[in-house]
């Protein structure tokens, strides 16, 4: 058969074949000389596994299925769902700037000792909402929230027996924090950014901006317990 006839036949066969592009997990790799079995994942499949996380099509992290004590929330996650880490054993956590919402009970009762929120000029934090009991009964000693946080749920930091200080940003809305710290027996200081229009801090005590109402008096400053405003 001539070279021309072979070329024509090859083109005819190529035209009869259609190709479909499918997604595979980003961690897939093959070493030379080995055979690897790969599960092909349809882009429409939900939830979408990514490492030890289950993340839906909207970027909501619905569950952590791993066993590591040190966890990094990946970039692209927009929300950490209610009780997403209910079966985890966390001690150290890094949260990417893309996270906008931390849901109710997200990290409740974790032995969490260190938390870092990505928040810099190149990657400003988008975190706006912290849900009810989000960090309740964790082992954190200090918390510095990103300046983007607006709402903080009831009992968000309740029962945190090792918590000594909290620093709040400029955007925390009025009406927050009245019931955020019950049971935080070691809490000695609540500081707030001077540019916050709703709150002011004097010697670690939280007031409304005009100082007309007491919002929270840290429990370690008061032997009788945590004082709260109306």
What kind of feature is each model-predicted range?
Residues 13-21:
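Hydrophobic core
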Residues 18, 26, 34-37, 95, ...:
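Generic short amphipathic/hydrophobic targeting helices enriched at N-termini
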């Amino acid at each position: 058969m001539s070279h021309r006839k072979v070329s024509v036949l090859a083109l005819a066969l190529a035209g009869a074949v259609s190709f479909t592009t499918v997604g595979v997990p980003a961690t897939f790799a093959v070493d030379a000389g080995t055979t690897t079995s790969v599960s092909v994942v349809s882009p429409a499949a939900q939830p979408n596994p990514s490492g030890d996380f289950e993340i839906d099509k909207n970027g909501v992290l619905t569950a952590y299925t791993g066993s590591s004590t040190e966890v990094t929330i990946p970039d692209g996650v927009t929300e950490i769902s209610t009780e997403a880490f209910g079966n985890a054993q966390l001690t150290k956590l890094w949260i990417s700037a893309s996270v906008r919402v931390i849901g109710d009970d997200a990290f409740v009762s974790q032995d969490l000792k260190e938390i870092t929120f990505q928040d810099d000029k190149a990657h400003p934090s988008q975190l706006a909402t912290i849900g009810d009991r989000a960090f309740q009964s964790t082992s954190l000693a200090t918390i510095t929230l990103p300046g983007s946080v607006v709402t903080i749920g009831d009992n968000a930091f309740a029962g945190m027996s090792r918590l000594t200080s909290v620093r709040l940003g400029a955007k925390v809305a009025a009406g927050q924090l009245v019931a955020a710290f019950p049971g935080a027996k070691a809490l000695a200081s609540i500081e707030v950014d001077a540019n916050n229009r709703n709150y002011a801090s004097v010697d670690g005590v939280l007031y409304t901006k005009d100082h007309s109402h007491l919002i929270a008096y840290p429990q370690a400053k008061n032997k009788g317990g945590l004082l709260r405003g109306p």
